[in-house]
Amino acid sequence: DPHENLLEGSPFLMMLPAVAGLLGLLAPRGLTFRHGATAPHHDAFKVKRGDPAMVVSEPLPRTFTSVADDMLLSGLNGKAMFVEKADIPTKAQVRAAIPAHCLKRNTLKSMIYAAISLTQSAACLAVGTQIPLKVAALPFWLAYAAVSGTVWTGMWVVAHECGHGAFSDNRALQDVVGYVFHTALLVPYFSWQRSHAVHHSRTNHITEGETHVPVVVNAREGIENTGGELELDNAKRFGKVGWGLVQLVLHLLIGWPAYLLWGATGGPKYGTSNHFVPVKPFSTTLWPNKWPKKVWRSDLGILGMLGMLSLLATKIGAAAVFALYCGPLIFTNMWLVLYTWLQHTDVDVPHLTNEEFTYMRGAFLTIDRPYGPVFDWLHHRIGSTHVCHHIDCTIPHYHAREATQAIAENFPKVYLYDSTPWFQALWRVACNCIAVKLRPSDGRYTWVPVS
């Protein structure tokens, strides 16, 4: 797979679980059981020009044949469950439908966007230095952390593009930019480049997926993640709302460091992997050939950054460093997990067995969502144009909107876009995407309804 070879703003976010919960309760559409519902007629989708993400109009009805009566439905209305392996176009077919210039990288333009994200991030930091380090100023520090962490996510996305080879044809330059930006956010650049390439090559693969792989009911050891029964029991014990809050805390606050340190939410193939230590006692499966050396090179940058922060703490105090740097970093990490969670998970989006999986089928199980103009600007449309990114990750973000339009127009049967507001979708996923079960008839793993 070619991916294996690639260099791979809002203060209320601190209270995101509670806010999302309230919003979810106010907007329950899509959370109810849909007995006798109708599904999209795949040939009836009509394309609307304008926002490339919002391209699918109301479909004509057809009786469900592939969605169980007890399956919850998202804004996709079960669409992903009707897509068969034979429906998926080849990568060459999709690339042919995308305007040729969208596949080209412009180094100057990429550097300008990198400079914009860097400048915005530095401006936030400058504002933070003016906030007094007093308990009375805590509300201002919370607002600073939320806004700054949201803005810093733009730097994260720039580094993400560098890791994919979407930044520039000058690979040395893009590695320097990506390494510096990711290291500044305590992300091991080359380590994550490798694991993220695996994620792209095995999206929604139940065994070999690298992130957000669910636990399975009646799981087979070594093939599926075990623990589905336990998770469902926990959900029943806490209640749907209670467990949804637990899920939000675990994912948004702990999820990113847990993934880096022991491969949390990964599939069983790669075991307990560590992005900083590519040797035993951790699993080494994720780090073949040249990659252990690259992991160590990533570690040098992280150690250097930690050293700089420690030195700064001796000058201005540990509390000041935590307030200025660690607070925003928590929010940046929250945004990262939020995006990846919602890009590949919803109540009616399946995972696949090895027999049913193909690279392009996994790519077309990615979901585009609306995040609004502010977040789209700050985060370079990483959430609203992610389908095209999974089809060809070398498409730069400034061409992704046009590429998405082409994909949606030419492949409406398989392109997934859910217009549900992101905070409602987040609450729906947190409350209901707990564990999956295998449907032997079609090799799909579907979410077990939570009562």
Question: What do the PLM-derived regions correspond to, one by one?
Answer:
Residues L142-A145, G165-Y179:
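Membrane-interface motifs of alpha-helical transmembrane segments
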Residues V147-A159, P188-W192, L253-P268, Y325-E355, ...:
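Transmembrane alpha-helical segments that form the membrane-embedded catalytic/substrate-channel core
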Residues W152-R171, W192-H205, Y339, Q343-V347, ...:
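Acidic (Asp/Glu-rich) catalytic motifs at the cytosolic membrane interface
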Residues P2-F12:
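Extreme N-terminal basic, low-complexity initiation segments
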